[in-house]
């Protein structure tokens, strides 16, 4: 049974969307891993991010399907952009991923991450990875930890 992903907590800050966009731009400019894998940030909002990647030939494993490490990197990247969207440096404290269908060369994957819970300095985020047909490829749950006193995108 598929459980729908929860929506992020409501934001009282009227500039929250602008902040999320500034963080996206600042992170992407420094994010060599995301750029090197050809990922793009398709959408950003407070506590949410959609990141896309097309499976290339050099991402295939010995079974001619996308290596799980690349799918994990995609899901982890969406998680990173979602949990940093509040402009507080936030890192992963752990994650789990389940692969439920293969991705193949040429597939356009989208990782959609949403905040499930954010309390104090810890958070929980769910990400699903879908192919271009909307078929679920993987489900990912990340746990985050927010560091003190350092913005991602200084004003």
What is the predicted role of each segment?
Residues 2-155:
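Terminal targeting signals and extreme-terminal segments of soluble enzymes
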């Amino acid at each position: 049974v598929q459980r729908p992903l929860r929506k992020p907590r409501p934001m009282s800050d009227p500039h929250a969307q602008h902040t999320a966009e500034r963080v996206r731009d600042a992170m992407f400019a420094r994010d060599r891993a995301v750029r090197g894998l050809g990922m793009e940030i398709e959408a950003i909002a407070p506590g949410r991010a959609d990141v896309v990647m097309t499976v290339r030939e050099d991402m295939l494993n010995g079974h001619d399907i996308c290596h799980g490490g690349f799918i994990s990197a995609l899901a982890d990247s969406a998680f990173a952009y979602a949990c940093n969207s509040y402009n507080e440096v936030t890192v992963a404290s752990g994650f789990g991923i389940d692969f439920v269908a293969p991705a193949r060369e040429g597939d356009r994957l989208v990782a959609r991450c949403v905040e499930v819970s954010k309390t104090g300095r810890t958070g929980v985020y769910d990400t699903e990875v879908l192919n271009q047909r909307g078929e679920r490829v993987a489900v990912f749950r990340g746990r985050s930890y927010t560091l003190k006193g350092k913005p991602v995108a200084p004003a």
